[in-house]
């Protein structure tokens, strides 16, 4: 298996006389060791049901694949579906399936259950992220009913701060039977099923995103002469207002002197503050949104439309790296660098930006001042860009580059 710019190291996981290996990226959850909560969930599940109790399993929020791939390794006859909203997690799950000689596993991207097309799983299992908001968690706990066969099981682990909330929510559901509730080492495991009188809830459910389970608040934003509306989401940065790095990018957009760009690419858009500012200030003909986080893409698209950007001008590219998978060049690239992905990934992104831009096109990049200094130093040995400007503010910087 070839190395990639996101790779950090390989972890070994020994379980039930099976040794598994997992490639991890430093920007994925639990890249130092296999998560304790994941191990607790697997141990509890296998001790109660054995390794061959379930024939069709859905691993929700699969990360780099520990739960789903381990269950498949222990019982090769079962069918496994795994999904995550993070394209990098999905990529590493696929790599780890290959690394462990596992075939016949469906691994794909989805925001909640939105892109799950089958509804006859006998086990839905998840290590629920600690950053998820309570509406997101309760939506998942309820929506699982629409994807289970009759008598199917939901098995989850949560961090202790969510234990009381989960227990209370499940306890008041008239059609839910809690089969197990166990806690240890800062985590709590729940097993539950929907009873025979669940009725309408066992039908496929509507999209959680469309129902608004991810929304945290609606707000009006004022920054300098810019006014816009936002619906902000849980588990994305800048829920109250644009942060320093977004402000630097918005100021750089205000300072552009060239004619309005025909096509712009916005990467890692978060809640969409910078994307909305670019739309209102520049009125581009097309906006390409690029991110590995599907929630960020959907939220930003929604906020652009909320601020009267026509939906047919927006294109979403859910992928790792900065690019659109098309041959069309863009006039302007704007975004915040993901520093946690590491220096190799950042350098690869700079190369991708050069590939996307037309000659004379500009890139507006924000990051910590340390990261921007490293980028400028690296560009001294390259010939793709002219450094036009750098602005600093409270440990952050914006860098303006022009494509030669």
Where do the language-model regions lie?
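Class I SAM-dependent transferase core
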Residues: 2-49, 206-256
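A SAM-dependent methyltransferase catalytic signature shared across enzymes that methylate proteins
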Residues: 102, 166-180, 193-198, 375-389, ...
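A short SAM/SAH-binding and catalytic strip from SAM-dependent methyltransferases
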Residues: 122-135, 331-344
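A short glycine-rich, Lys/Arg-flanked "PGG" loop and its adjoining helix->strand segment in the class I
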Residues: 138-150, 347-359
């Amino acid at each position: 298996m070839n190395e990639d710019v996101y790779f950090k190291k390989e972890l070994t996981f020994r379980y039930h006389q099976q040794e598994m290996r997992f490639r991890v990226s430093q920007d994925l959850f639990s890249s130092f060791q296999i998560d304790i909560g994941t191990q607790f969930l697997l141990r509890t599940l296998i001790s109660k049901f054995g390794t061959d109790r379930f024939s069709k399993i859905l691993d929700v929020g699969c990360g780099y694949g520990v739960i789903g791939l381990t269950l498949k390794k222990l019982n090769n006859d079962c069918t496994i579906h795994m999904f995550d909203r993070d394209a990098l997690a999905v990529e590493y799950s696929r790599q780890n399936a290959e690394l462990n000689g596992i075939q016949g596993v469906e691994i794909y991207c989805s925001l909640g259950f939105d892109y799950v097309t089958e509804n006859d799983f006998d086990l839905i299992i998840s290590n629920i992220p600690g950053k998820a908001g309570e509406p997101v968690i309760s939506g998942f706990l309820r929506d699982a009913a629409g994807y289970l066969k009759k008598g199917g099981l939901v098995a989850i682990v949560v961090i202790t701060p969510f234990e009381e909330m989960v227990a209370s929510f499940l306890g008041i559901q008239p059609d839910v039977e809690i089969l197990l509730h166990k806690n240890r080492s800062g985590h709590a495991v729940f097993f539950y099923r929907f009873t025979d009188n669940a009725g309408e809830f066992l039908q496929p459910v509507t999209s959680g995103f469309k129902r608004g389970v991810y929304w945290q608040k609606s707000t009006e934003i004022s920054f300098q002469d810019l006014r816009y509306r936002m619906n902000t989401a849980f588990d994305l940065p800048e829920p109250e207002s644009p942060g320093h790095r977004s402000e630097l990018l918005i100021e750089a957009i205000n300072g552009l002197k060239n004619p309005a760009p025909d096509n712009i690419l916005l990467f890692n858009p978060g809640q969409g503050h910078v994307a909305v500012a670019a739309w209102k200030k520049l009125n581009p003909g097309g906006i390409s949104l690029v991110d590995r986080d599907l929630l960020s893409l959907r939220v930003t698209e929604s906020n652009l439309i909320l601020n009267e950007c026509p939906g047919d001008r927006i294109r979403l590219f859910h992928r790792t790296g900065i690019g659109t998978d098309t041959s069309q060049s863009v006039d302007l690239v704007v975004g915040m660098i993901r520093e946690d992905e590491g220096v190799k990934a950042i350098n690869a992104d700079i190369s991708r930006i050069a590939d996307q831009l037309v000659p004379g096109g500009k890139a507006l990049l924000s990051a910590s001042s340390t990261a921007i200094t490293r980028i400028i130093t690296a560009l001294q040995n390259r010939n793709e860009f002219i450094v036009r400007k750098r602005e600093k503010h409270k440990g952050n910087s914006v860098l303006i580059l022009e494509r030669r």
